[in-house]
């Protein structure tokens, strides 16, 4: 079956949305223009999992979502419509705890002797002899002694006669050799149970000990997701066997790799994965998609960072594109005034670099102490492997490692001991230089040696008296092997630290404008000019033309249209400043006195107002009843978001020890200002009405760019209409697919749907359907076609982005092409009460330069109009007359 990747739709599978539910939507997705379903993880996960990333058995497909038979039914439906399937897989980690994960349970029962011990990234050696050879098991809900005394932790026998340690709803296996001693004279008391548990291959402990004591790599700081050693060939095959079987059987056509930066050797993993899939292509049935296997990696790229050239992948999952879109559609003139407003209202620093460093320091100390200790031990072992470095103390190495890890500005470098590229070398050099300012003079030799190891200098240089192996050394003490192990530990620490410090902390602390705080974006990153956006697109077309282009994901902080609405505030900072200050005065009586302070804190209050702007429904009837209904509908969503935001920020509450008093005060404030007798909802509705036209311009600009820039557009389920969602779980709410199918069947004219905000869902969906139909008619134009920036001049040039996609497959006077125009930063050019469109007088004498080969007659895809384009300067005002975007093809 021939199917060209044109557009994906991400579906979230769980017990409430199964393979059969997805199969019922295939016809709708096909009509919309989707070529591939992009499925969340489908392997057996924890009972009731809502996302599938907590895999318990990689050898089975989840029965909760339909099992193998359900998958086959879905694929059959896809094949009937000539569509493919991309599968999200989780090589980095598995769910752990009790016996729900068979491989983990076997490790707990047998320790290092388990045949599955090599699967998990466990550090079996411990300085404390009593813990050496044991798995730290931080799965108790309370202190170990209290759990034993209360009976929360106890021994029990199941119906089959097997004895377990039972804690809450989890069972932990008892060594076979200990079974005869149990229940011999009746049930053991707490002291006897303690002695028995002390003999096990694991050490049960309170969950709070994980950050300090855990001796296995976690996914971020989650104590129930254990790192998997896919760098081991046997583990790779064991964890991927079913995936390869599904690919060979033609049931899947590509893979999305979750958290690639967690792996020991991401590049090596990608090469091994590519080789295995390519080897299986000849075994695939004729009915399967005939394109090469797609491999897409979840990788957060810092500004200016690129995927390594030697990774054989199609590209990323699209967070980098999201960041570029955000940069393009925010007004650069609003950046510094918004920061000043934040500082004025909150009294907090507005420098993102200060906040990021503080967050990194806090997270490293409170969430990754055990991971830092493992990394320190790895470098200390490297130091001990040679006489020259044996006097580098563990304490000194810890101090300098702490400072360097904090200063690494990207998720990680890529070095497994064989060296790294110039970009990574510059990253390390910068981190070392910045760390030097925090290191005391006595630690500088340790910092210099660490710099040498990280820069790629051999652990033992050629020649010299100490270059020869010392007597009694084993292969395990080989300096190059030790350096490799230390480098891997270092890289597996910087990646989760970056994620937790920025995405899960700073984004909830510092928010001059919340639409900028999105996964893939950098705090305080500058906006993107049209020229810089063009450069990014040209670069993507050259290096990764089949990477995904995302605007929404299951992990986003805010939906694409939430962000586009808030982005308008960057264009009207003075008005926003007056408005938010008036809101604060209006709502001051609803604040709660708490321990001598008023709640909410101004920073939390400012974030709340932005969130309410983002989710408030547009197009309401101008009545109190309509506003009260809307307030009641969004209140639970916003309350859930706010509690999560307060805890993620780790300032006035947190996940470990929530300040329930402060949280309750904030909730009371929210309920008061959104109450039926409050005047605030009317003020909120007034502002949302005010910014809706410019917000819709942003929405259509973002949508058109996603569908026409180099790459494969990925549409997160439900975001084909306006997506005003918040962070999970809000962005994973069920979608009304029947409504969406009805909207599509109505075949709405996009321009006709602009007048009323109530029709904006239909307008966005119609734009998507029409452009995807264009892509279906000429897939190569958008996959391999050149990206040609078009010059715009005149008074409103900054408000237009223009480019062409030009076919490289056909030569001629007028090659197949599409010309794309999108309005941007439209707020100040739209008259009060106007439609989502910059009027002709707003464009004035702005011109777009049409190259000779692209001149001639054109068909406008979104309106059906026929346009004649002459070579040279062409008035923009005559092109953007019905919509704020144009997509036209030569005829």
Placement of each model-derived feature along the sequence:
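Carbohydrate-interacting/catalytic domains
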Residues: 1-47, 55, 59, 64, ...
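ATP-hydrolysis module of ASCE/P-loop NTPase motor domains
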Residues: 142-146, 155, 163, 348-381
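Conserved short loop/turn motifs at secondary-structure junctions
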Residues: 92, 257-263, 756
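Short helix/strand-capping turn motifs
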Residues: 105-108, 295, 406
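Hydrophobic or amphipathic alpha-helical targeting/insertion segments
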Residues: 74-123
């Amino acid at each position: 079956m021939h199917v060209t990747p044109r557009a994906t739709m991400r579906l979230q599978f769980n017990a409430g949305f199964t393979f059969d539910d997805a199969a019922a939507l295939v016809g709708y997705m096909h009509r919309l223009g989707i070529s591939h379903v992009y499925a969340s993880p489908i392997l057996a996960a924890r009972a009731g999992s809502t996302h599938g990333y907590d895999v318990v058995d990689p050898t089975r497909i989840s029965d909760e979502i339909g099992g193998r038979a359900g998958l086959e039914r879905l694929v059959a439906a896809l094949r009937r419509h000539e569509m493919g399937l991309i599968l999200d897989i989780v090589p980095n980690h598995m769910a752990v705890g009790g016996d729900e994960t068979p491989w983990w349970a076997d490790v707990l029962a047998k320790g290092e002797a388990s045949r599955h011990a090599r699967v998990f990234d466990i550090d079996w050696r411990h300085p404390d002899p009593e813990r050496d050879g044991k798995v730290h098991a931080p799965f108790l809900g309370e202190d170990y002694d209290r759990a034993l005394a209360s009976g929360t932790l106890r021994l029990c026998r199941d119906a089959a006669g097997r004895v377990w340690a039972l804690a809450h709803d989890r069972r932990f296996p008892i060594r076979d050799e200990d079974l005869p001693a149990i229940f011999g004279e009746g049930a053991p008391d707490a002291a006897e149970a303690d002695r028995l548990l002390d003999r096990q291959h694991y050490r049960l402990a309170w969950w709070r000990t994980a950050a300090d004591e855990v001796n296995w790599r976690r996914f971020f700081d989650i104590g129930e997701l254990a790192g998997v050693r896919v760098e081991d060939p046997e583990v790779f095959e064991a964890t991927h066997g079913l995936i390869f079987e599904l690919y060979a059987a033609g049931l899947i056509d590509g893979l999305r790799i979750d958290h690639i930066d967690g792996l020991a050797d991401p590049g090596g993993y990608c090469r091994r994965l590519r080789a295995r899939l390519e080897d299986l292509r000849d075994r695939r049935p004729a009915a399967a998609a005939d394109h090469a296997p797609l491999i897409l990696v979840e990788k957060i790229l810092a500004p200016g960072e690129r995927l390594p050239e030697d990774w054989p992948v199609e590209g990323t999952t699209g967070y980098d594109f999201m960041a570029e879109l955000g940069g393009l559609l925010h007004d650069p003139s609003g950046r510094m005034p918004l920061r000043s407003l934040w500082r004025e209202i909150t009294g907090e620093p507005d420098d993102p670099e200060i906040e990021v460093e503080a967050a990194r320091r806090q997270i490293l100390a409170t969430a990754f102490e055990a991971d830092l200790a493992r990394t320190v031990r790895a470098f200390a072992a490297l130091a001990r492997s040679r006489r020259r470095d044996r006097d580098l103390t563990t304490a000194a190495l810890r101090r300098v490692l702490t400072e360097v890890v904090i200063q690494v500005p990207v998720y990680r470098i890529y070095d497994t001991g064989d060296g790294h590229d110039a970009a990574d070398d510059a990253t390390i050099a910068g981190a070392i230089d910045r760390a030097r300012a925090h290191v005391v003079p006595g630690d500088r030799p340790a910092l210099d040696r660490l710099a040498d190891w990280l820069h790629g200098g051999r652990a033992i240089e050629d020649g010299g008296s100490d270059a020869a192996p010392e007597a009694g050394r084993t292969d395990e003490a080989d300096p190059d092997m030790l350096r490799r192990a230390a480098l891997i530990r270092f890289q597996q620490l910087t990646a989760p630290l970056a994620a937790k410090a920025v995405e899960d902390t700073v984004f909830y602390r510092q928010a001059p404008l919340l639409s900028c705080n999105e996964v893939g974006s950098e705090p305080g990153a500058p906006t993107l000019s049209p020229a810089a956006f063009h450069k990014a697109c040209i670069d993507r077309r050259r290096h990764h033309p089949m990477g995904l282009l995302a605007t929404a994901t299951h992990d986003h902080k805010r939906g694409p249209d939430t962000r586009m609405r808030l982005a308008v505030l960057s264009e009207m900072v003075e008005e926003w400043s007056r408005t938010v200050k008036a809101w604060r005065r209006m709502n001051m009586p609803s604040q709660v006195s708490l321990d001598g302070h008023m709640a909410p804190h101004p920073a939390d209050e400012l974030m709340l107002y932005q969130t309410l702007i983002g989710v408030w429904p547009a197009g309401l009837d101008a009545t109190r009843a309509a506003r009260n209904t809307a307030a009641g509908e969004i209140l639970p969503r916003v309350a859930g978001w706010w509690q999560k935001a307060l805890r993620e920020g780790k300032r006035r509450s947190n996940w470990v020890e929530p300040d329930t008093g402060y949280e309750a005060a904030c909730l009371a404030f929210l309920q008061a200002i959104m109450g039926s007798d409050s005047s605030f909802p009317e003020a909120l509705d007034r502002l949302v009405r005010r910014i809706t036209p410019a917000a819709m311009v942003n929405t259509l600009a973002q949508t058109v760019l996603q569908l026409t820039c180099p790459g494969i557009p990925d549409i997160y389920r439900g975001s084909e209409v306006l997506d005003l969602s918040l962070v999970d779980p809000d962005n994973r709410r069920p979608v009304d697919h029947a409504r969406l199918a009805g909207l599509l069947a109505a075949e709405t004219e996009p321009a006709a749907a602009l007048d009323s905000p109530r029709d904006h869902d239909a307008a966005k969906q119609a734009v998507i359907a029409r452009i995807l139909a264009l892509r279906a008619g000429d897939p190569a134009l958008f996959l391999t076609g050149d990206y040609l920036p078009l010059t715009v001049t005149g008074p409103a040039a900054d408000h237009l982005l223009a480019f062409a996609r030009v076919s490289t497959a056909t030569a001629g006077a007028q090659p197949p092409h599409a010309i794309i125009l999108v309005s941007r930063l439209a707020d100040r050019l739209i008259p009060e009460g106007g439609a989502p469109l910059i009027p002709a007088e707003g464009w004035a004498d702005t011109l777009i330069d049409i190259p000779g080969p692209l001149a001639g007659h054109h068909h406008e895809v979104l309106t059906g109009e026929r346009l004649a384009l002459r070579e040279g300067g062409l008035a923009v005002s005559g092109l953007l007359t019905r919509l704020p975007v144009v997509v036209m093809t030569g005829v």
